[in-house]
Amino acid sequence: MIQTYSTTIRRKEMDAVLTCMVDEKIGPGELNTRLIQLVKEFFKCDGAVALRSPAIALGYALTALELEKGSKVMISALAPAWQYQALVSYGYVPEVLDVNENDGLVSVDEIKNGIENGGKILLLHETEGIVPKFDDILELGVPIIEDISMSAGASVDLGELDGVGSERNGNDKSIVDNRKKVGSFGVYTILGLEEKDVITAGG
């Protein structure tokens, strides 16, 4: 049987794990600092925080957005289970949106329905690395938390996005060769490094 997800760990990464164990240090260290710097350089963002899990990151993002407890957060029906579980545990109400059968993404019409039903924030999961049409979604004006755990490294041709052109992103450092990386469209971005994500970490 061919596994859909197959995590790997290289000798260099194993050596890093062993080094941490030998150092007998608990808490943020050199590797944590290097990871943050790499993320900032790759995504051309001004700030990043390394946390143990994407669920913890989601909690901080919702707190930063000052979302009231009991508010509805829109998520994809194909979103990983941790998103639903985390929202419930933090006191929010998941508004599950159906997906398009052709690409597995939430449609703009479905997001509109979610907003009409009281959805305050869109937690945008880019299923299996498939990138949505950001132009139409951004026009809705709803705050977006992008989950790029499965799409990290992908980019969008700005020539295909009429509303996300130079007038909106003239000074955007994330735009290179008229392409904009996923993770730079939302208010906050979550990059999970779990075993089924596109980039995995050793824990």
Where does each model-flagged region fall?
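Short active-site oxyanion
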Residues: 46-48, 71-72, 120-121
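Hydrophobic residues at beta-strand termini and immediately following loops
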Residues: 51, 97, 193
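Active-site phosphate-binding strand-loop segment of PLP-dependent enzymes
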Residues: 102-201
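Conserved PLP-binding active-site segment in aminotransferase class I/II-type PLP enzymes
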Residues: 1-64, 68, 90
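Conserved PLP-anchoring active-site segment centered on the Schiff-base-forming lysine
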Residues: 59-114
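A short beta-strand submotif of the Rossmann-like class I SAM-dependent methyltransferase core
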Residues: 50, 75, 124
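Conserved donor-binding loops in enzymes that form glycosidic bonds
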Residues: 6-7, 77, 127
